[in-house]
Amino acid sequence: MNIREWPAEERPREKLLQRGAGSLTDTELLAVFLGSGVRGCNVVELSRGLLVKFGSLRRLLEADREAFVGELGLGPVRYSQLQALLEIGRRHLATSIERESAMDSPAAVRRYLKAMLRHEASEVFGCLFLDTKHRPLAFEILFRGTIDRASVYPREVVRRALVHNAAALILCHNHPSGISEPSQDDVHLTLSLKRGLALIDVRVLDHIIIGDGEPLSMVEHGWIVV
């Protein structure tokens, strides 16, 4: 059945306008984003099939370009639109958190960093630079690729801390494998950066690892001491 023939309260777009986006299912949200179906398949049926194919809304959103554009009803235009929407969401979250008076909630920090890194397909390393009151100054992704002592240069982290006049910072990187537990390289790298930054009186408050599930704090798990 064509969606135009559905009762108004059951159409995803009208439902969103009447009740808000939070009232929609994953299928309905995806249907609103896609806007239209394909021949012989309305947009809700298409959305439902895509979620079954990818396994979840999250996996669809995190799919690489090749997997995404290869599906019926998707393509490079919608892939570009989706990437733009995801980046808008990340920037909105970043701006919202950066307006806070201080980032004194570990949970808020983890939510922020997860939003910044969770959609990265490869391993990336970043820093959240903070002032003397632990208010955010800036967030930067500094390195991409395999994150170890050979690929992350302490002098570059020190240089960026000086550029931002940071008093403290929080290190972060993602594990695309989904496993959050740090490797020995992660621990050694953190200690090396901690020593280097101490020379310019910049404190390393934590190193957050983003995988599947909840982000991991190396401080809370005892891998580093501040």
From Swiss-Prot:
What is a biological process (GO) this protein takes part in?
A: proteolysis
Q: Which residues bind Zn(2+)?
A: 173, 175, 186
Q: What is this protein called?
A: UPF0758 protein PP_5284
Could you tell me which SUPFAM superfamilies the record lists for this protein?
A: RuvA domain 2-like (SSF47781)
Q: Which Pfam families match?
A: RadC (PF04002), UPF0758_N (PF20582)
| GO MF annotations in UniProt | metal ion binding; metallopeptidase activity
Residues forming the motif JAMM motif are 173-186
**Which Gene3D superfamilies does the UniProt entry name for this protein?**
Cytidine Deaminase, domain 2
Q: Where is the MPN domain?
A: 102-224
Question: Keyword annotations for this protein?
Answer: Hydrolase, Metal-binding, Metalloprotease, Protease, Zinc
Q: What family does this belong to?
A: Belongs to the UPF0758 family.
* Keyword Nucleotide-binding applies: no
Any keyword Hydrolase?
Answer: yes
